[in-house]
A protein has these predicted regions:
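Short acidic/histidine-rich active-site segments
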Residues: 107-108, 132-153
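Extended, charged catalytic domains and RNA/DNA-binding interfaces, predominantly
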Residues: 1-107, 111-113, 117, 122-129, ...
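Mid-to-C-terminal alpha-helical segments outside catalytic/metal-binding sites
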Residues: 151-175
């Protein structure tokens, strides 16, 4: 309620540690949603908020996807098919997010795409597009000052060019 009153319309339940709501992909236990976490997801959805699974453990992602009645988002991360990092989503999780009508944001840092090149970003986006459709993939930069990336926002044209080089149509890029 506090976050909603402050104007938030999307929130994640975890970051780098397990907490009273859910297990983090970076946590010690990496558990699923707690009973309180289940209540929070239901309350967020009742208010029209979007649940972000970006730092959730695999068990947490599975629990959220089972409960979801609204689109779920992974705001920033990668995909296992192109970068086998623990935090990245596997194909079943990608399909699960898409089944909610949700969106997967592809990050720009090495742990998301195993490299910092625009071509690696495009490769991950191409995988999601091929698996579930362009409407379920987006850029998920995570420009927060703590993430090391190859380029700043003034160089986003490099990502656009990489998308063109990877075969994305103008309509896909605008989607």
């Amino acid at each position: 309620d506090t976050l909603y009153a402050a104007g938030f319309r999307m929130a994640g339940l975890t970051h780098f540690f397990d907490n009273d709501l859910a297990g983090s992909m970076h946590g010690l236990k990496k558990g699923g949603l707690t009973p309180l976490g289940q209540q929070v997801v239901a309350a967020m959805e009742a208010k029209g908020m979007v649940v972000d699974i970006a730092h959730c453990s695999n068990a947490c992602v599975a629990d959220i996807l089972k409960l979801a009645r609204r689109p779920v988002v992974s705001s920033h991360g990668g995909v296992q098919a192109t970068c086998q990092v623990n935090r990245n989503l596997d194909d079943d999780q990608i399909r699960g997010v898409a089944a909610t009508g949700g969106l997967i944001g592809i990050g720009y840092w090495d742990a998301a795409v195993c490299d910092t090149s625009p071509a690696s970003i495009a490769k991950a986006m191409k995988h999601v597009q091929g698996l579930v459709g362009i409407q379920h993939v987006a850029l998920g930069s995570d420009y927060d000052g703590a993430t090391t990336v190859r380029f700043d926002t003034s160089k986003l044209v490099q990502v656009t060019q990489a998308l063109i080089d990877a075969g994305f149509s103008d309509a896909d890029i605008r989607a």
